[in-house]
């Protein structure tokens, strides 16, 4: 493996699956008999804001359970960033809305789909740390003071992902692009591998099983994230000592 000045890592739901993050979907893809798309869109929030808040309040409470912790894959990526400090940069672009990367110690994390432990004011656009339930007819925006303007700081269906300009800039300088625990179905993230290749990066997929865009990667390794990610990180760090 050649020396890398910049490693960009895209993470999806697969990296957090072993940490006890509930998907809140049953076998039919439903949440309390509602399609998830019906509680995760701007139109849904307009039609029934209380239902949307209930959905995200449950997800937020689940994330804050003591049983939900970073797993070995998260801690391995934090180790990679720390030990390559001074030799190169490690960026994590995550589709996940949890904070497990940060809790594991990663610093350079971009949340392209938002963050569950933050709220956003629909009146001002300001974003706030938020760890309790959002109750529309009770909670006021800490900034403007308006009632009923707070929503989860989450990118809903039909909304533009966050940090896209910054992500493109990072991809343009990336030597190695790695996708971990992603389905390859969700765009624009599923297209990052092509963007990275366009800029000359080597590409690697670490996944539980083959994803929809697996054929685009130069190499793929399959298995549980908590197993294959630490092994890969150890290999990268071992190679870096030879440089």
From Swiss-Prot:
<dbReference type="InterPro" id="IPR027546">
    <property type="entry name" value="Sirtuin_class_III"/>
</dbReference>
<feature type="binding site">
    <location>
        <position position="59"/>
    </location>
    <ligand>
        <name>substrate</name>
    </ligand>
</feature>
<dbReference type="GO" id="GO:0036054">
    <property type="term" value="F:protein-malonyllysine demalonylase activity"/>
</dbReference>
<keyword id="KW-0808">Transferase</keyword>
<comment type="similarity">
    <text>Belongs to the sirtuin family. Class III subfamily.</text>
</comment>
<dbReference type="GO" id="GO:0008270">
    <property type="term" value="F:zinc ion binding"/>
</dbReference>
<feature type="domain" description="Deacetylase sirtuin-type">
    <location>
        <begin position="1"/>
        <end position="239"/>
    </location>
</feature>
<feature type="binding site">
    <location>
        <position position="56"/>
    </location>
    <ligand>
        <name>substrate</name>
    </ligand>
</feature>
<dbReference type="Pfam" id="PF02146">
    <property type="entry name" value="SIR2"/>
</dbReference>
<dbReference type="InterPro" id="IPR050134">
    <property type="entry name" value="NAD-dep_sirtuin_deacylases"/>
</dbReference>
<keyword id="KW-0862">Zinc</keyword>
<dbReference type="InterPro" id="IPR026591">
    <property type="entry name" value="Sirtuin_cat_small_dom_sf"/>
</dbReference>
<dbReference type="InterPro" id="IPR026590">
    <property type="entry name" value="Ssirtuin_cat_dom"/>
</dbReference>
<keyword id="KW-0496">Mitochondrion</keyword>
<feature type="binding site">
    <location>
        <position position="121"/>
    </location>
    <ligand>
        <name>Zn(2+)</name>
    </ligand>
</feature>
<dbReference type="GO" id="GO:0070403">
    <property type="term" value="F:NAD+ binding"/>
</dbReference>
<dbReference type="GO" id="GO:0010608">
    <property type="term" value="P:post-transcriptional regulation of gene expression"/>
</dbReference>
<dbReference type="InterPro" id="IPR029035">
    <property type="entry name" value="DHS-like_NAD/FAD-binding_dom"/>
</dbReference>
<dbReference type="GO" id="GO:0005634">
    <property type="term" value="C:nucleus"/>
</dbReference>
<feature type="binding site">
    <location>
        <position position="141"/>
    </location>
    <ligand>
        <name>Zn(2+)</name>
    </ligand>
</feature>
<feature type="binding site">
    <location>
        <begin position="12"/>
        <end position="31"/>
    </location>
    <ligand>
        <name>NAD(+)</name>
    </ligand>
</feature>
<feature type="active site" description="Proton acceptor">
    <location>
        <position position="113"/>
    </location>
</feature>
<feature type="binding site">
    <location>
        <begin position="181"/>
        <end position="183"/>
    </location>
    <ligand>
        <name>NAD(+)</name>
    </ligand>
</feature>
<dbReference type="GO" id="GO:0017136">
    <property type="term" value="F:histone deacetylase activity, NAD-dependent"/>
</dbReference>
<protein>
    <recommendedName>
        <fullName>NAD-dependent protein deacylase SIR2rp3</fullName>
        <ecNumber>2.3.1.-</ecNumber>
    </recommendedName>
</protein>
<dbReference type="GO" id="GO:0005739">
    <property type="term" value="C:mitochondrion"/>
</dbReference>
<feature type="binding site">
    <location>
        <position position="225"/>
    </location>
    <ligand>
        <name>NAD(+)</name>
    </ligand>
</feature>
<dbReference type="GO" id="GO:0036055">
    <property type="term" value="F:protein-succinyllysine desuccinylase activity"/>
</dbReference>
<dbReference type="GO" id="GO:0061697">
    <property type="term" value="F:protein-glutaryllysine deglutarylase activity"/>
</dbReference>
<dbReference type="InterPro" id="IPR003000">
    <property type="entry name" value="Sirtuin"/>
</dbReference>
<keyword id="KW-0520">NAD</keyword>
<keyword id="KW-0479">Metal-binding</keyword>
<comment type="function">
    <text>NAD-dependent lysine demalonylase, desuccinylase and deglutarylase that specifically removes malonyl, succinyl and glutaryl groups on target proteins. Has weak NAD-dependent protein deacetylase activity; however this activity may not be physiologically relevant in vivo.</text>
</comment>
<feature type="binding site">
    <location>
        <begin position="95"/>
        <end position="98"/>
    </location>
    <ligand>
        <name>NAD(+)</name>
    </ligand>
</feature>
